[in-house]
Regions:
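Long, highly charged, low-complexity intrinsically disordered interaction regions
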Residues: 56, 63-81, 87-90, 422-520, ...
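Phosphate- and other anionic-substrate recognition elements at nucleic-acid/protein interfaces
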Residues: 42-43, 49, 296-308, 314-317, ...
Length: 783
């Protein structure tokens, strides 16, 4: 445990006792959100980011340490464990590095070397290596049926020597470092026939770059090309220096007689070209791939975090619009709680072309149900549908409607899911998509947790990375986001409750079932009546579960029940009541936190409690804002260089950001065009859902590519790491048809419960998040 603690402390730049405390809590079953918020004294202030890193690395290092012990045991059994080898085994920082060290010693009963030694050639190989003797003379008198001639015997001895030399870990480690300095990654098109079907990879049909300098997104693009049998990849490098180093290691230039020297130098060449170099090539590419995957997963995680925590429009009656052409445009009205009030299908486009009837139906639904927001899915026919809605709004200006473009990525996945069938059993599968779109605008977090994060469309090469690792990473992000906001236990769906600290899908469903059978929970203590929700689970979850208008005012806040006694002391000291102190800034700021420190409550907890009392149930998400698309620009062909546009960031990568400007094809703002100053990390400048002003740099209608800039016109381009824009072929987000979208009344409100967002007035128009998700299309006179 000591080595493990020391390593984690070093990696996280914290004290060992902090790591020990966190490990103890994790091993006892505490979740990261719970530890981060309610056990600050125990960990001495480790935050959620540090705890996530610790949790991830703890699992990895435990696996590594366990494997290390098995390797050491195996080496001992083989009598191969020298002091130097033990040092190297203990110094291996990754599983791959450990396996590389162990590989030459792994028992192999089918190797050519093992077979040759079994035939009695081992002593002869040692003699040739150590003594000044002609190899042919050394073999005089040897006879074995598996090696009937001199050539086969000499080959077999080379296999023995090569395997023995491979156990010189100091040498092979040095050879790897030497080769890595000149290593180049090369890609070539697999065949002429692949040029057409794999044209999206054409920038890599004849490409090479220093392996050390290949950025992660470019490597993943090439690996995808290889996976699709379009590209062939090869790690190339110089052989002279490694060969010279091998000859120096074994002093081969001084070997006598000449026949022995020639033989051993040939063996050295075979050792390098046939044994060591292929292993090193594979190792270097694997290391680079794993690093690229980790980086891609981090990009996905950050994008997902921003998306989930994007601004909710709040409790406002919303019309969800799921565009379509032949199958019609699906409509669904949901109330402030997300319950379905009405649904319909209109056919404004070919082949029916019922524009007049469609306008009438849109206006009827908006007027009859007093609709406030119109959420329009951004897939096929979205701009045509937006134009239709805009026409209806112009003809019914008294309705004071606001229309917003919402990402429908993953809507079809949700619509066809078992969860959608449970929530909307009476609705056709195609209508469910419209319901989901409306709810996404009201509360993105509550709705998006129902969808596999990989279907949301904010990942960078998400299908090319380790899927198990990706799933764990994204699940942690969702868990952190849900717990940072909190949920109303009396309205939340099982889908979002399942991410609350201490809960799982099964217990979440038990809570929902109990609520249906027994009515709303009046206080947090009532949760203990739920089957399988014991004391330990209650301790973990209670602080993140809110109860509005219950018998205990503190239940609507993030104050944990274990701190209610502390609040009572504060209230008593200030001669007031719990109800009166909540939200009373004047009283709270008069409290001296240090006066209440005791063995049970430390200063961090007291300060957190006071902050929560001042603004109970605060929602960490940004304010709802809107942006505008130009109504006269709906296709790439309508763009021109120099055009100034407003758009929304849909995806952030390591080489720039993609922005939806309303033309069915996201434009790329290269990293060098994000700002006037140097930008090392695009995530520090923009995030998914951010509304930005862009300028069109270039338009390629044939290739459907748009390059944008966020720098003021005339400003000198900021220097950026050299990252050719070839990578955008694989990254551009095109608005594609969603396929047949599954076509109802959802359980009472799934929305998370930070303080419930206030319905924004139409004229405030504040959207901001949901990635491309939330955009107001600007309509004159639309307030």
């Amino acid at each position: 445990m000591t080595d493990l603690v020391q390593q984690l402390a070093k990696e996280l730049a914290v004290r060992p006792n902090q790591v020990e405390a966190a490990i103890k809590l994790i091993d006892e079953g505490a979740s990261v959100p719970f530890i981060a918020r309610y056990r600050k004294e125990v960990t001495q202030g480790l935050d959620d980011t540090q705890l996530r890193q610790l949790d991830t690395r703890l699992a990895y290092l435990r696996d590594l340490f366990e494997r290390r012990e098995k390797v050491i045991e195996s080496l001992k059994e083989q009598n191969k464990l020298s002091d130097d080898l033990l040092v190297r085994v203990n110094a291996a920082e990754t599983k791959n590095a450990l396996e590389e060290i162990y590989a030459p010693y792994r028992p192999k009963r089918t190797s050519k070397s093992f077979k040759a030694k079994e035939a009695g050639l081992g002593p002869i190989a040692e003699k040739i290596f150590a003594e000044a003797i002609d190899p042919v003379e050394a073999l005089a008198g040897f006879s074995h049926e598996d090696y009937p001639d001199l050539e086969s015997q000499l080959d077999a001895i080379q296999h023995i020597l090569i395997d023995d030399w491979a156990q010189n870990i100091a040498l092979t480690t040095e050879l790897k470092a030497t080769f890595a300095k000149t290593a180049v990654l090369k890609s070539l098109v697999a065949s002429d026939e692949k040029k057409e079907v794999g044209k999206k990879f054409r920038d890599y049909f004849d490409f090479s770059e220093s392996l050390n300098k290949v950025p992660s997104h470019r490597l993943l693009a090439m690996l995808r090309g290889r996976q699709e049998n379009v590209l062939g990849l090869k790690v190339d490098g110089e052989d002279e220096a490694p060969l010279a180093r091998i000859e120096t290691e074994y002093n081969l230039d001084a070997v006598q007689p000449q026949a022995r020297q020639d033989y051993l130098k040939q063996t050295a060449k075979l050792f390098w070209l046939g044994k060591v170099r292929p292993t090193i090539e594979h190792s270097l590419l694997t290391e680079k791939r794993l690093a690229a995957e980790a980086e891609a997963m981090q990009v996905f995680a950050e994008n997902l975090r921003h998306l989930l925590l994007s601004a909710p429009a709040g409790a406002r009656t919303t019309l969800g619009v799921d565009p379509g052409i032949r199958t019609g445009v699906k409509l669904a009205v949901v109330n402030e709680s997300g319950d379905v009030l009405a649904h319909s299908t209109i056919y404004p486009f070919a082949p029916k072309d019922d524009k007049a009837g469609s306008l009438t139906e849109l206006a009827r639904l908006c007027r009859e149900f007093n609709v406030d927001l119109i959420a329009i899915g951004n897939g096929t026919a979205s701009r045509e549908t937006e134009a239709l809605v805009a026409e209806m709004m112009a003809a019914n200006s008294d309705l004071k409607l606001t229309r917003v473009s919402v990402s429908e990525a993953g809507a079809s996945v949700y619509s066809a899911s078992e969860l959608a069938s449970q929530e909307l059993p009476e609705l056709d599968v195609s209508i469910r998509g419209a319901v989901s779109i409306a709810r996404r605008l009201q509360d993105p977090l509550a709705e998006l947790v129902k969808i596999d994060p990989k279907s949301i469309g904010v990942g960078q090469y998400q299908h090319d990375v380790n899927q198990t690792g990706l799933a764990k990473t994204l699940e942690a992000v969702v868990e952190d986001c849900v717990n940072s906001v909190g949920v109303d236990v009396n309205t939340a769906s099982a889908a979002i409750l399942g991410y609350i600290a201490g809960l799982n899908k099964s217990i979440a469903q038990q809570i929902v079932d109990f609520r249906k059978e027994n009515g709303r929970f009046d206080n947090r203590q009532a949760l203990k009546k739920v089957p399988r929700l014991g004391e330990r689970t209650f301790e973990q979850a209670a602080g993140f579960l809110r109860i509005q208008n219950g018998s205990e005012p503190l239940d609507a806040s993030a104050v944990h029940p274990e701190s209610y006694a502390l609040v009572s002391k504060i209230v008593e000291a200030k001669a007031t009541t719990v109800k009166d102190i909540i939200g009373n800034t004047e009283i709270i700021r008069q409290v001296n936190a240090e006066e209440f420190v005791d063995d049970q409550f430390g200063l961090p907890t007291i300060q957190d409690v006071l902050s929560e009392l001042e603004k109970p149930g605060r929602d960490p998400r940004p304010e709802f804002r809107t942006a505008k698309f130009r109504d006269d620009i709906t296709e790439v062909s309508q763009l021109s260089e120099g055009m100034q546009l407003e758009g929304v960031v849909t995806n952030v990568t390591n080489f720039g950001a993609f922005v939806d400007v309303g033309v069915h094809q996201d434009g790329l703002v290269h990293i060098s065009e994000l700002a006037n100053e140097f930008v090392s990390d695009p995530h520090k400048v923009v995030k998914p859902g951010q509304i930005v002003q862009v300028r069109v740099l270039t338009v390629d209608v044939e290739r459907n590519r748009v390059n944008l800039s966020m720098r003021p016109e005339g400003a000198a381009a900021a220097k950026a790491p050299r990252q050719p824009r070839r990578d955008q072929n694989e990254q551009r987000t095109e608005r594609k048809p969603q396929g047949k979208r599954p076509q109802q009344a959802r359980p009472q409100g799934d929305r998370p419960q930070g303080k419930k967002p206030q319905a924004a007035k139409p004229q405030d128009n504040k959207i901001g998040g949901l990635g491309a998700l939330l955009l107001q299309a600007g309509i004159k006179g639309s307030k």
